[in-house]
């Protein structure tokens, strides 16, 4: 499976019990939504390997999972801190103006005046709206290391071109 076709949706944590259960850290909006995306792939030694989910449950406000064929604590320990990925093709298509975060990360951000503000390094959820975390270049004329730009489509974000990995914003470079 090609690495660029896989999107990370979570991570395995430490072991739970002696029968091969592992804690799970989901990066989906609703933690248990991670189970809607199957099959899973685990990134082991830099390579994505398919794995089958046997069971899952909540325990003390944590998600724990049992993976098929992992029946002992010692074997499960080898999977601690391993990323969980799914094939991008399973995600539904979005409406105009909606984007998956993984599509925005890595995009160059340019304001209406043509100033290159930096590259989207991550996204933040604030409750009111999502925020682009833009890592500025080391030669930024305004001395910025990072900019937080609200992802308000049409108000602040004027254009997203995923083919050229460019986001055009109406935002002052000094902020």
Swiss-Prot record:
The keyword Cytoplasm applies. GO terms for biological process: ribosomal small subunit biogenesis; rRNA processing. Keywords: Chaperone, Cytoplasm, Ribosome biogenesis, rRNA processing. It comes from the Bacteria. GO terms for molecular function: ribosome binding. Its main location: cytoplasm. Residues 96-175 form the PRC barrel domain. It is found in: Cytoplasm. It holds the Pfam family RimM. Belongs to the RimM family. NCBIfam families: 16S_RimM. Binds ribosomal protein uS19. This is Ribosome maturation factor RimM. The lineage of its organism: Bacteria, Pseudomonadati, Pseudomonadota, Gammaproteobacteria, Pasteurellales.
